[in-house]
Structure formats: structure tokens, C-alpha cells
């Protein structure tokens, strides 16, 4: 190793070297000074002493002889060059700024001369860049990048149109670093005293402060003011920084800062996970748009006053408000922000007068806080920011490289840039009137910029076009500016942040949840008895070849009811139903409900142990069964399908619609099924609304392929009674046979399909090879699982005139609670959206603190309204856990465990599950129940289930 390498190695190991009284001294952490390095130091001791003793103080010096020799780019410049490559995420463009100023450049010749002298003075205006990561200053350029337009005789409208046209041409102009002059000046002379100057500048050649330098120089030269020649140039500064990195003091600081960041690296979060448009690809969007907000001088002074009171810098406070806004829309609440650092070291009097890129970056980790107030969060923010800036010898770019080495997220596209308090006595925007500005940066999605202006302080977001859904940024920026507005009040600082949804969002949510509709107060079987009196001979049910009129079904129900009464069944009792599909199954349900009792449908094919669990959990009095082996308890009733022997008519107990009607058991995560106890009123609210919305009537024939223990059957049965429609059931032996469905549809001209998507996909596949002209339904209801867009396309192709509706919700909320007509789908929808609430039902998407989520923020879907279940039968703990009153929204809600988000139009999108629940053909299956069942066997004591 040479001497510099030895010194570098010592610094890396935090070994300090110094000379005192002509002798070399060192201080080393324990174990850092290994034998090999000691030998190197010992062998080169005299040279090290000489270097440390006689090394000149590193000062920036002008090297006129090497002015045009190429020199290295900075880390920031290298990242800008890399970002121009469209192969990188969010790349494909340069970093540049476009600005328009109101100026007094009204003499064309003087302006051309001023620009010529400006280009001669500032070497970086003549810079070129190579593919190898080098830059060089050209001795001269052949043509000045100037355009001048005389608009003295134009109207104001014409002037504005001309300027806008030019703005659209050059504000996002992309320069070729290897060939182009990297800036443009366009001057519009309006009259003898006023002009508008448009500046387009690639920030490879100059940072934000460089615009100030450019305008100052231009104004001085134009005004014939004495302008002192520069004693150094940008190349001299880069040479200085290269030498600086070899200095022992810098090396000690560099490795100290590197250790600081490496100690944090494993704890650093990723970028904010804010929803992006599903149709966005990183190569499509090459432009930015801007949202801006100006604090006038009075407001800014009040803002500064509050910051001083709480000992917080304005920059730290603005950063916190920006992060709090991002947090509200981010899936992850801990994230990284890129901070732009204005870094012009005080090493020469001319350092503030040079055009060039002096910026650096650092990272800021925002973490969700348990703080009780904004002031505590602001203090924490300021401390982290100060600590990170103090360790900036190891730059943000270098930290990102370390993250990449560890296969962690290394593109942080959310940026914060503040020139408030940057050290400049004056800022460009404070001295001249800015009419318009916008910047663009590769691999950046939102750049929050804070800068002083002639009017106060400008806060703007430069946002990459096409990345976010329309309206999202408007809502975010509205909340951000409201936080700024509120920060001039002590109450804001002294309390926790109150989540603020934008006014438009609040308006849309209120409208979407305004679902109140007056329906009759009916129970589930009231309509059945009405039809029995009015239309006793009308066919209400067909199963296979067997038809059931209202009177026939009533007689069968009366036979079953007699047996129930003989066994002491009364109002409120729970009765299990284990019958196969058919008239006797439906009649059993009618018989049970007529007594005010509760029917509990049970799958007779499931393991006996699970049936026992259901019987015990529901406190079932007796079960109605058909096959001898299905008997569960001594009191159970076996049905003879050929015995319609009751001499008594079907009794109908009058009861309130708020009493329980049925209890459907779903999979439980503890291994024990949970029974959802539903009232007549809750189920009827959904049934009446679906029949009303989609005009289900006595002309309809409903295909009822769902099992009784699946809540879609509740609609099939009782919608038929309510609407006087006909219910068509498949034979039990062929209920899963698609060809049997086809036969039924062909024979009976079924008009309403009520299926889960998997069933519909099977049916559509069958129809592709069979004539479906006689099987054209009027209405298709799909629910129970994701509904793929391709399925809807197939349905539209096969049945172009059929109304198809996606439905969703939970067994705990009365069959369905939400709907979406599929004819309203967009081309970009990969699945049918969840939709909007049904009548008298309301939806909320809540975060972990039960606050409403902003648009496109994933949270838990919660349902409120008239269709909510009573709870889980005989399980008050689970009921209290899942059915809760939420003060923030003043509602009793059911926590579905489903994850979703609101679009900006109020439509809800289903995203997935919070837990391990999965859907199998529409049925809810808790993986925990499967695991608990497996663990009962010795070989499976340690097992886990996952969805594949």
C-alpha cells in the first residue's frame, strides 16, 4: 500500500493518526489495528509523518491551464445521468427546471450581448457530458440558445397564448448531454418596460441556486453594471472536493458517518407505498404537473413565530407536515424520504457566484409516532433530520448504494427540497417576480419544494404525470395545505393530528353512504303465506321433474310443523336442517320459521365431529334429517318424503321481524365453527332491495344451485316468495353437474342466475360447446369471490343483453351489502370492483386507529346498517370483537377482516384479507380451523396451512 492508502485504511478502521513533537501517534479501537496494518504503518512511518506534517492546507485554486480538460461528475450528476435511461424504474428523463420571470429586458441587442457574456463567464453553460461519467467545458459554443419575440402590438390574450404555446414546447424539453447546450432562454418583449423571460435548464449544469446566479449575472451585464471576474470555476471546486476526500480529517469524518449509516441500514424502512394507477408503466409518463400554495408574508411570519415558540425550524416543520400527509395515503406508515441538501461550502468568496451543481442528498426516516402531540413529533423530526445532516459526509446517494447491496429498496421517489434557511441572504424568488415554474427529476414521483418568494413562501409539489389516479394528488395537497394553515394555532401543536379527508372526498363518501330507503317491515315467510292465500295453485318450486305449488308446499310444511310441535319446538328454538335439496328441505325451513323458531342449515356430508360442534354451539333442540345415519340426537326427526299426513293447517306465529330467522355456520379460526345469527329484518332488507333494484318479479325463474348452508340460498328461497317468482332447484344427486343446470335452464327458461364466479366459469365453459340460444338469462348475480374481468367479457359475448351484477358483503351482513353493475367496468379493471352499498347499508374503510382511510389507502372494510347480524350465536366474546360501536363514525359496524380501498369516485375496490381466511367456491374457510383439525393427529402436531 502507498501512504495515502495506508492513511485511508486507518481512517476506515477509525484509527486516528497524528504527529506531535516529530513523532507519529495513534489511537485505535480495540482489535482494529491488526499486525499487517501495523507493519505497513511502521514501514512507511517517515513518509506518513512527512505527509501529515507538511501537507498543505487544501484550498480551492484556479487552474486555468486545465479549464477545458474533462473532470468527474458528482454523485448527484451521475444519478441524473443514470435516470435518463428508460430501462430504470421511473427513469427516461433528465433533471431540469423551467421558469418564467417578469423582467425588464426590453432591448434585444443588449439582451443578446448579455447572454453572450454570461455564457463566456459561466463555464457550465458550455458543459458537455460523456458516457463514461465525465464532464468538460467547451471553449465556446457556436450558437447561443436564444429566442426573442416582439409582442408590443399584441393583445393580452394573444401574449398569454404565445407564452403558453412556448411553455408547452420547452418546459419538458429533453437535452442530450453529449451534444446539446443544456439550457434555453426565450424572451417575450411586451412593451418598453416589461418582458417575460422563459428559462429551461438541465440541472446537470446547475442547481436551484444557479438560477439565481444566472439571473443576477444577466441583469448586471444587461444594466452595464461592473461585474467582477470569477477567480474560480466549477471545475476548480470539483478538483478541490477530490483532494478533500484524501484529507485525513475528511476521511475520519467520512468513515465516522459511514459507520453511523451502516448501523442504521437494517432498520431503515422503504419508500412510501402510495397507490399508483394500475395502467401506469414507468416508461409512459415523461412530464410533471404542479400543485402550489403560497403563504403570504403575514401567514409565513405567524408560521415562523409558532416554530420559534416550539423550538422547531420552519424546514423541519414543513418536512413533518409533508410526511404526515404522505403517511395518511401510504400503506406503510414508516418510510424514507429523500432530502435535497443545498451544499455550497464556505471555501471561497466566489462559491456563491458559480453556476454548477452543488447539491447533495440525505435520507430521512419517518416513523409512526406514539407522541401525544404534533410538537413532540416535530421535535423528533428535527432531531432525526439534524443527526442525519450532521453525518452527511456519507451522502444519501451512498446510503442508497448500501441499501442496494443489501437487496433493500434503493429508489426513494418522494423528495423534500427546502431553500428556506439555506444560507443565502437572498433567494432568486425573493428578488424578482416568478410567473411560473416547474421541475422534473428522474426516479421521483413527488418533490415537495419550499422557497421564499417576493410574496411570501411558495410551497409546491412537482408530481410525475400519470402515476397516480386522478384526484388523488388534489386530495393529498388539500390536506397538506390545511395542515400548514392549522399550524399557526397552538391547538394544532399541542394535540395529536386530526386526520383530514379532503372536502370532495367527504362529499362523495356522504353521498355514497346516503342509502336510506323505506321498505315494508316484513319477515321472511310473510310473503309465502300471502301467496298461499292469493295463488295457492301457482307453482313456486320445481326440483328436477317435481313441481310444488304454494298449497302443496304448505301441506308438506304443515306435516313437518306438526312433528316439531309434538317435540316441543317453540318460538326462538334452534332447529337443525340436514335434508337434501328439494321441496321437503324448503318446507322444513317454512315450518320452522312459521313457529318463530330459527333454522340452522347443516351440511350432512361433513365430519360428524364438526356437526356435533355446530349442534352444541347453537344449542340446537333437534335436527330434521332424512337418512338414518344422519341422526345426531335422540330428539331428531326423520322425514318420510312420502308422508304428507298432517290434518292440521300450517300455523303462523305472529312475531316481530327483529327476531332471529336463521343461523349459518362459517369456518372459525380457532377450529370451532362460528354461527352467524341473522334476523328476519336484516335478511329481508337485502332481499327487498335486490328485488327492487333489479326488478325481480313473478315473471322470473331463479336457478337455486347454492346449498342451504350457504347464504346465497336465503336469497333464492325468500326472493322467490317475496317477488312471486319460481325457484328451480337441481336434483341433489346432480347439483354440481353443469349439464344438469343446462337442462334446467333449457327446459324452464330460467331468467335469474345466482352463482359464485367459479360456478359461472364452469357454466360458461359448458355453454361454449352447447347451444345457449334457449338459455338467455335476464339477470346474473355473481358473488362470493373475486369476479375476473375475463369472465364478464365472456358473459357479455354470450349474453349481450343480460344484466350482470357483482355483489359482495358478508354472511354477517345479510347475504350482500354492496353491488356493482358490470356494464360500468372500465377497460383497466382486472376484477369487478366491489362497488357501492345497497339500500340501508353503509360502508367504511378504517385504518388501525379506526379513522376513515383516504382514497386509495388500504384499510379494513367495515359494514353498518339494517342488514347486520345480531352476532355470533352463544359467543359474546367474538361478537364484541367483530361487532363494535365506533365513535369516530357514530355507528355499530361489523369488521369484515377484508381489506379494501376507496377510489376517488367513491367506488370500493376489494384488495384481500387481513387474516388467513380463504374462499373455496364462495365458501369461507379459515386455515386455522384446518390446522386445528390436523393437529389432533400426533404426526401433525406442528403444521401450518397456506393458500396456493
Language model: regions and residue ranges:
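Carrier-protein-dependent adenylate-forming modules in NRPS/ANL systems
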Residues: 1-232, 301, 329, 362-363, ...
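Non-catalytic, low-complexity flexible loops and terminal extensions
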Residues: 66, 218-288, 365, 376, ...
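Flexible, P/S/T/G-rich "lid" or insertion loops adjacent to the active sites of thioester-utilizing
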Residues: 83-92, 255-312, 500-505, 540
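His-Asp-centered acyl/peptidyl-transfer active-site segments
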Residues: 86-95, 112, 123-124, 179, ...
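Conserved AMP-binding
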Residues: 203, 531, 579-582, 603, ...
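AMP-dependent adenylate-forming
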Residues: 425, 508-509, 623-653, 683, ...
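Conserved AMP-binding/adenylation subdomain of ANL enzymes
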Residues: 674-703, 711-751
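Gly/Ser/Thr-rich phosphate-binding loop
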Residues: 722-725, 750-754, 764-833, 842
Amino acid at each position: 500500500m502507498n501512504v495515502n492508502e495506508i492513511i485511508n485504511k486507518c481512517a476506515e478502521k477509525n484509527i486516528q493518526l497524528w504527529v506531535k513533537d516529530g513523532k507519529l501517534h495513534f489511537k485505535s479501537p480495540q482489535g482494529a489495528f491488526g499486525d499487517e496494518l501495523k507493519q505497513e504503518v511502521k514501514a512507511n512511518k517517515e513518509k506518513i509523518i512527512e505527509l501529515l506534517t507538511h501537507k498543505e492546507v487544501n484550498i480551492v485554486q484556479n487552474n486555468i491551464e486545465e479549464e477545458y480538460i474533462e473532470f468527474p461528475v458528482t454523485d448527484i450528476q451521475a444519478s441524473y445521468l443514470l435516470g435518463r435511461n428508460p430501462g430504470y424504474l421511473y427513469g427516461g428523463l433528465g433533471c431540469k427546471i423551467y421558469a418564467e420571470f417578469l423582467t425588464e429586458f426590453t432591448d434585444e441587442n443588449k439582451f443578446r450581448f448579455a447572454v453572450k457574456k454570461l455564457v463566456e463567464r459561466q463555464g457550465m453553460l458550455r458543459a458537455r457530458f460523456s458516457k463514461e461519467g465525465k464532464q468538460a467545458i467547451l471553449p465556446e459554443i457556436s450558437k447561443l440558445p436564444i429566442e426573442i419575440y416582439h409582442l408590443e402590438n399584441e393583445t393580452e390574450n394573444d401574449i398569454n397564448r404565445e407564452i403558453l404555446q412556448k411553455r408547452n414546447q420547452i418546459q419538458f424539453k429533453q437535452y442530450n448531454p453529449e451534444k446539446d447546450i443544456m439550457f434555453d432562454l426565450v424572451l417575450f418583449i411586451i412593451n418598453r418596460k416589461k418582458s417575460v423571460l422563459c428559462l429551461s435548464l438541465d440541472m446537470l449544469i446547475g442547481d436551484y441556486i444557479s438560477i439565481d446566479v444566472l439571473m443576477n449575472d444577466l441583469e448586471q451585464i444587461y444594466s452595464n453594471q461592473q461585474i467582477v471576474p470569477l477567480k474560480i470555476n466549477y471545475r476548480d471546486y470539483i478538483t478541490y472536493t477530490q483532494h478533500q476526500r484524501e484529507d485525513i480529517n475528511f476521511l475520519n469524518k467520512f468513515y465516522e458517518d459511514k459507520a453511523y449509516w451502516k448501523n442504521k441500514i437494517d432498520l431503515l424502512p422503504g419508500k412510501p407505498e402510495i397507490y399508483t394507477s394500475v395502467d401506469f408503466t414507468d416508461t409512459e409518463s415523461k412530464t410533471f404537473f404542479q400543485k402550489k400554495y403560497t403563504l403570504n408574508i403575514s401567514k409565513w411570519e405567524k408560521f415562523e413565530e409558532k416554530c420559534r415558540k416550539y423550538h422547531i425550524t420552519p424546514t423541519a416543520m414543513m418536512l413533518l407536515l409533508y410526511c404526515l400527509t404522505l403517511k395518511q395515503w401510504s400503506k406503510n406508515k414508516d418510510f424514507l424520504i429523500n432530502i435535497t441538501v443545498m451544499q455550497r461550502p464556505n471555501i471561497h468568496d466566489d462559491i456563491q457566484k458559480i453556476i454548477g451543481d452543488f447539491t447533495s442528498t440525505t435520507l430521512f426516516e419517518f416513523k409512526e409516532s406514539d407522541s401525544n402531540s404534533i410538537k413532540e413529533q416535530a421535535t423528533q423530526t428535527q432531531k432525526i433530520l439534524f443527526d442525519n445532516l450532521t453525518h452527511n459526509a456519507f451522502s444519501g446517494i451512498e446510503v442508497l448504494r448500501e441499501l442496494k447491496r443489501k437487496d433493500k429498496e434503493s429508489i426513494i421517489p418522494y423528495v423534500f427540497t427546502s431553500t428556506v434557511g439555506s444560507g443565502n441572504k437572498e433567494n432568486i424568488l425573493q428578488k424578482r417576480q416568478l410567473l411560473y415554474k416547474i421541475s422534473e427529476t428522474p426516479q421521483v414521483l413527488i418533490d415537495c419544494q419550499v422557497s421564499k418568494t417576493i410574496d411570501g413562501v411558495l410551497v409546491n409539489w412537482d408530481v410525475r404525470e400519470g402515476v397516480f389516479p386522478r384526484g388523488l394528488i388534489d386530495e393529498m395537497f388539500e390536506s397538506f395545505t390545511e395542515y400548514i394553515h392549522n399550524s399557526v394555532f397552538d391547538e394544532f401543536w399541542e394535540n395529536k393530528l386530526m386526520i383530514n379527508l379532503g372536502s370532495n372526498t367527504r362529499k362523495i363518501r356522504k353521498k355514497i353512504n346516503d342509502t336510506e330507503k323505506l321498505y315494508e317491515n316484513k319477515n321472511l315467510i310473510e310473503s309465502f303465506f300471502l301467496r298461499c292465500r292469493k295463488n295457492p295453485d301457482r307453482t313456486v318450486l320445481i326440483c328436477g321433474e317435481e313441481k310444488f305449488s304454494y298449497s302443496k308446499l304448505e301441506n308438506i310444511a304443515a306435516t313437518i310443523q306438526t312433528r316439531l310441535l309434538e317435540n316441543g319446538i317453540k318460538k326462538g328454538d334452534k332447529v337443525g336442517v340436514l335434508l337434501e335439496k328439494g321441496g321437503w328441505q324448503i318446507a322444513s325451513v317454512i315450518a320452522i320459521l312459521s313457529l318463530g323458531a330459527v333454522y340452522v342449515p347443516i351440511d350432512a356430508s361433513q365430519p360428524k365431529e364438526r356437526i356435533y360442534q355446530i349442534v352444541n354451539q347453537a344449542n340446537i333442540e333437534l335436527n330434521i334429517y332424512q337418512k338414518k345415519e344422519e341422526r345426531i340426537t335422540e330428539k331428531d326427526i326423520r322425514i318420510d318424503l312420502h308422508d304428507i299426513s298432517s290434518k292440521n293447517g300450517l300455523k303462523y306465529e305472529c312475531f316481530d321481524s327483529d327476531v332471529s330467522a336463521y343461523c349459518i355456520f362459517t369456518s372459525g379460526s380457532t377450529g370451532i365453527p362460528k354461527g352467524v345469527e341473522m334476523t328476519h329484518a336484516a335478511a329481508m332488507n337485502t332481499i327487498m332491495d335486490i328485488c327492487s333494484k333489479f326488478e325481480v318479479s313473478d315473471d322470473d325463474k331463479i336457478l337455486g344451485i347454492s346449498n342451504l348452508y350457504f347464504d346465497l340460498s336465503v336469497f333464492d328461497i325468500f326472493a322467490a316468495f317475496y317477488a312471486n317468482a319460481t325457484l328451480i332447484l337441481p336434483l341433489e344427486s346432480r347439483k354440481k353437474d353443469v349439464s344438469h343446470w343446462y337442462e334446467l335452464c333449457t327446459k324452464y327458461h330460467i331468467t335469474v342466475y345466482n352463482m359464485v364466479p367459479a360456478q359461472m366459469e364452469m357454466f360458461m365453459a359448458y355453454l361454449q360447446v352447447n347451444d345457449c340460444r334457449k338459455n338467455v338469462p335476464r339477470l346474473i348475480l355473481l358473488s362470493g369471490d373475486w369476479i375476473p374481468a375475463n369472465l364478464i367479457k365472456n358473459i357479455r359475448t354470450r349474453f349481450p343483453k343480460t344484466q350482470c351484477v357483482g355483489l359482495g358483503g358478508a354472511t354477517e351482513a345479510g347475504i350482500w351489502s354492496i353491488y356493482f353493475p358490470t356494464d360500468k367496468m372500465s377497460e383497466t379493471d382486472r376484477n369487478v370492483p366491489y362497488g357501492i352499498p345497497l339500500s340501508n347499508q353503509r360502508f367504511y374503510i378504517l385504518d388501525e386507529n379506526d379513522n376513515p382511510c383516504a382514497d386509495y389507502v388500504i384499510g379494513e372494510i367495515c359494514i353498518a346498517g339494517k342488514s347486520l347480524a345480531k352476532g355470533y350465536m352463544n359467543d359474546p366474546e367474538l361478537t364484541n370483537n367483530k361487532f363494535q360501536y365506533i365513535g369516530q363514525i357514530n355507528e355499530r359496524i361489523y369488521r369484515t377482516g377484508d381489506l379494501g380501498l376507496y377510489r376517488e369516485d367513491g367506488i370500493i375496490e376489494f384488495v384481500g384479507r387481513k387474516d388467513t381466511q380463504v374462499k373455496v367456491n364462495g365458501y369461507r374457510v379459515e386455515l386455522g380451523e384446518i390446522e386445528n383439525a390436523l393437529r389432533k393427529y400426533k404426526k401433525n402436531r406442528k403444521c401450518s396451512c397456506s393458500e396456493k
